[in-house]
Amino acid sequence: MNRKRTIILDTETTGINQTSLPHINHRIIEIGAVEIIDRCFTGNNFHVYIQPGRSIESGALKVHGITNKFLLDKPIFKDIADSFLNYIKNSILVIHNASFDVGFINQELEILNKKIKINTFCSIIDTLKIARELFPGKKNTLDALCTRYKINKSHRNLHSAIVDSYLLGKLYLLMTGGQDSLFSDNTINYKENFKKLKKNIQLKNNTLRILHPTLKENDLHEKYLQYMKDKSTCLWN
């Protein structure tokens, strides 16, 4: 049986270009990715720090805490490019605010004169787009969504590509619980998918309606949250 790999991915960078595309004149310094198959974390992860060949901006340092000194002995992107590409090849990539990370990764590939873009050999799902459909008008950062879904993020003092990938993986499973078939292996048709998804979660008038649980349902929900806190690696509805 050919089981499709889902890779949850995040990056940290030297900073963000405020006047052009975010990746212009900046580089990736960390890649974190976790593998999910059959809605289970497999433990087959990819994590690397990268020497960017330029200094880290102070604003970015405050976000992720990764220093120039720490990166001095780390590999450059060229040294890890092939292993990274082999890891994500033909997978479904799940990324929060995908255009940001994809822009940085494609720039790194362009610097190496590789005539490829990751969206040509991976399907890409943007969880920010999913969140905006589910919660229009709400704050939909990773931090805000973890709070909304009661995902424990007490260990997330600073941004970390590998930690954030794991949190995003748990979040993605919860947001799409029981809805794997909504997403095509080759292309993501958000318009049609979210027509189905909105119907399934009873969205009306483009706003999220709160359906109050019965006492029994609430008790089951509390037991389910406790189950999650016990660090189960698989999530089902």
UniProtKB/Swiss-Prot annotation:
A divalent metal cation 2 binds at D10. InterPro entries: DnaQ, DnaQ_proteo, Exonuclease_RNaseT/DNA_pol3, RNaseH-like_sf, RNaseH_sf. Binds 2 divalent metal cations. Magnesium or manganese. A divalent metal cation 1 binds at D10, E12, D164. The active site is at H159 (proton acceptor). GO terms for cellular component: cytosol. Keywords: DNA replication, DNA-directed DNA polymerase, Exonuclease, Hydrolase, Magnesium, Manganese, Metal-binding, Nuclease, Nucleotidyltransferase, Transferase. GO terms for molecular function: 3'-5' exonuclease activity; DNA binding; DNA-directed DNA polymerase activity; metal ion binding. It is an enzyme of class 2 (transferase). Substrate binds at D10, E12, H64, D164. It catalyses: DNA(n) + a 2'-deoxyribonucleoside 5'-triphosphate = DNA(n+1) + diphosphate. Signal peptide: none annotated. Its cofactor is Mg(2+); Mn(2+). GO terms for biological process: DNA replication proofreading. Its EC number is 2.7.7.7. The keyword Disulfide bond does not apply. The keyword Cell membrane does not apply. DNA polymerase III is a complex, multichain enzyme responsible for most of the replicative synthesis in bacteria. The epsilon subunit contain the editing function and is a proofreading 3'-5' exonuclease. The DNA polymerase holoenzyme is a complex that contains 10 different types of subunits. These subunits are organized into 3 functionally essential subassemblies: the pol III core, the beta sliding clamp processivity factor and the clamp-loading complex. The pol III core (subunits alpha,epsilon and theta) contains the polymerase and the 3'-5' exonuclease proofreading activities. The polymerase is tethered to the template via the sliding clamp processivity factor. PANTHER family: DNA POLYMERASE III SUBUNIT EPSILON. This is DNA polymerase III subunit epsilon. It comes from Buchnera aphidicola subsp. Acyrthosiphon pisum (strain APS) (Acyrthosiphon pisum symbiotic bacterium).
